[in-house]
Amino acid sequence: MRLPESRLAVLVSLPRNEAALAQAAVRAGADGLKVHTNVRHRASGTTFGPLDAEREALRDILALGVPAGLVVGAAGSVSIAEMTAAREMGFDYFDVYAADAPSTYVEACGPVTPMVALGPGDGPSQAQALVRRGCGALELSTLEPDRYGTPLTLATLARLEAVASAVDVPVIVPSQHALVPDDLALLRAAGAAAVLLGAVVTGTDVAAFGARIAPYAAAL
């Protein structure tokens, strides 16, 4: 997984697979992007189709030349055949909730970094077991959906520190909390390798997208 070595990375989860959103994020200073297939995204309200339906838009986003990861689905919608096809497109990593990942997920990723998202109740022991099974990065899902948009808490920082200190792979924190730029230093100090800005903080409007991302990139 391609991340800056000396600082926290700012990644952006696109609320739609649109090149205009990707371009705005890159201009605002994003180090990488995340796109989706086969899932309904809670925070943005977007339903993403299968790889064939999203392929043209994904190619346009990948053509920007910044590292991009692909969410390959949710419970019951992850297609190993689609993952095999997507490996050839140039994605930096694949991502799925660990609880939704097929047993052959790591092998299906091939040369693409296999990332999995921990559930809100998963801690260091679960993280260690996933790394032992070949996962190359972890997304620390921090909140149940009914708490999305709440401020960063001490409990989340403590959980992040516990997980990050237990594994030797990057730990990425998504903005399920309503993170503010000043939170990035706290996340870095607790062991995060990257923050993943999503719809909770970026919104979904193309016109405002870059302006909402820029303060986080400037805070590094």
Question: What kind of feature is each model-predicted range?
Answer:
Residues A20-A25, S77-E88, D122-R133, V169, ...:
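Catalytic cores of alpha/beta
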Residues G32-R42, M89-T104, A137-Y148, R188-R212:
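Glycine-rich phosphate-binding active-site loops on the catalytic face of alpha/beta enzymes
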